[in-house]
Amino acid sequence: MATTAVPAIKIAITPEPPIFQTIAEERLHRKQRLASAFRLFAKFGFSEGVAGHITARDPEHEDHFWVNPFGMHFSQIRVSDLILVNEKGEVVEGDRPVNEAAFAIHSRVHMARPDVVAAAHAHSLYGKTWSSMGRLLDPLTQDACAFYEEHSLFADYNGVVYETEEGDRIAQAMGRRKAVILQNHGLLTVGRTVDEAAWFFITMDRSCQSQLMAEAAGKPVPISHESARIAQQQVGNPRVGWFQYQPLWDVIVREQPDLLD
């Protein structure tokens, strides 16, 4: 019996993330992108007191990660403010403390996912509001399709995460996906670059906002399974996630060049 060939999925051709000649160059690049992500999170209103953290794995010491110092507002963070934390939760570079919750969650995600360079978590308004629904996002828009079959739900809220055992459970719930909804808490995204992890957090929060608004207005019509899977590969792949962040980088560096200090 003859079979019908499945047409190849059309994916936009985009530039690729840079490749570095030295570890020092790669480390600086990751730290610069990390500082820019904090400034953008502040710009988008993702700050909530001292809550929230974005981490970037060190390119040399891969069980260490760079993170924001505890108690510093996202809008004030510069490259020189970032701290380096080892696998024991000790600050080995920098003179500020680490958020224990950041270590409990992110250290276990980085350990479980050696493919992941960065992880982003914040108590963004729409992300935490949607998390209280105890549901996955539906494929209501093209942008939301980035997460179709690519996010999960961690439905075990027990207060602030201080124990690495709970971090292990969060990492297990995420699996090989790019994001997890922490019920009654917020969103967590990961990526092979800081750019990718930050972009997918930004667009996931907006997708939460979009679905909340759509359901408040009426009964939204979801995208079909077949079309959502195609769109997921088109807008949800790592290279596109990295590329989507580049205009945001250009804007924030021009507006707030001190972040590179």
Predicted regions and their residues:
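A conserved C-terminal secondary-structure "cap"
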Residues: 2-37, 178-261
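Short glycine-aspartate micro-motif
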Residues: 66, 117-121, 181
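A contiguous binding-surface segment within folded domains or other stable secondary-structure elements
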Residues: 152-189
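Solvent-exposed alpha-helices and their adjacent loops that cap or buttress functional pockets
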Residues: 46-48, 57-60, 74-77, 110-113, ...
